[in-house]
């Protein structure tokens, strides 16, 4: 009886640990997304003006959480989404080269919808850097 209880307790502990560890990467990605959404809300309230420091700070926190998903949970299904989210945050922080490099690192491994979003953000970064024709060409390729 004691042996069976011990095995049951171990199985329960193992299940508990597995459940919460699998939730960790989702929770970290969720936090990154929350910071991004908060930053977007602040930015859009001041549209047409400089991006407020509070939004820049939230984008920075989103980048930090996204990096945590990427480094701590490299096999997670959220890695590509975290990279795109990080690049979008970098775009709004005017870190265009970082955003482009991060997106390019996953361009061949993402599915169609994410690939279109990735190309769109690369084009926006190139446009902001002053590479207008390159940005236009990328967007034209995207819609053709």
PLM feature segments, named:
Residues 2-3, 17-144:
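Acidic, polar-rich low-complexity tracts and alpha-helical solenoid repeat scaffolds
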Residues 1-13:
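Bacterial N-terminal signal peptides that target proteins for export
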